[in-house]
Amino acid sequence: MSALRLGTRGSALALAQARSVAALIDGPIEIVPITTAGDVDRARGDKSRWTGALEAALVAGDIDLAVHSAKDVPGELAEGTAIVAAPRRADPYDVLVGEDRLDGVREGARVGTSALRRRAQLLAARPDLEVRELRGNVDTRLRKLAAGEADVIVLAAAGLARLDRLGEAGGRLDGELFVPAAGQGVIAVQARVPSAAADAAIASVNHASTMACLQAERAAVRALGASCHAPVGVSARLDAESLQMRGFAGLPDGSEWVLDEHTASAADPAAAGAELARRMQRAGAGDVLRRAEPGNAGPGGRVSSRVFAQGAKPGGAA
């Protein structure tokens, strides 16, 4: 029996994710590290810089499955491929490193992150903070924190856990305002369809509840028309037969945001995600996201136009 070839980026986190997928599949596995454009140049670009080389290898038949961090996968996939499986989701939320609680971070502290979503949420909760761009993989960001380039950094809990470094985290950020990126904490397995590899992944790797949440979250982002770096967060949680969804869209300076939630049948995750997006659009998310694009910030100062779930103002830290 020939080995099933799992393509992955070569970072420590990506390899850990690939090994976790391999452990779920019966039979011989070969993990194939592939260098992506994002590994070579971390300058801001679209999500395909992290996935394009993997997709090309998949389409060419050089690998059987591509293993991704789901939050890095673009909305449009290579023709003839699909996300066919997702193992059980890890913690989807963000954590502080360097402080236990957001309200314990000193006034004016330097907080490091590279995500516009996190920047928008941090400044919405704490406009006094100095949010600095901090790039690199998890290890690099932790080294930069230790070197004093920031007082506190924000990372995904899942990434730290997969590297056995969750003990370095402080508190988890309040998911009411700090809605995570779509797919955060999920490992996405992409395959050519139809294929025996896809069938194997579905049978042994896929966690149905996680896949339903991922489908709903990705559908919401597509329906919002959000670019790959837009300050948008979408989360879904399966509760019995219902999907509990929450969405965030904001300006990078934290001055304006839309926050909404939606509950729908889990029978059609894509429809649930699209409906959350429609609710957010009606509340002004489209205008917020248009102005969040570089060069589109409109005139005026800090204007608030906020939609709070159930009418309650969100807090800043768990």
Q: Predicted regions span which residues?
A:
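Small-molecule-sensing regulatory modules
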Residues: 1-36, 41-47, 51, 124-318
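N-terminal glycine-rich phosphate/adenylate-binding segment common to multiple enzyme folds
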Residues: 46-94
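Glycine/Thr-rich phosphate-binding loops of Rossmann-like dinucleotide-binding domains
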Residues: 76, 121, 163
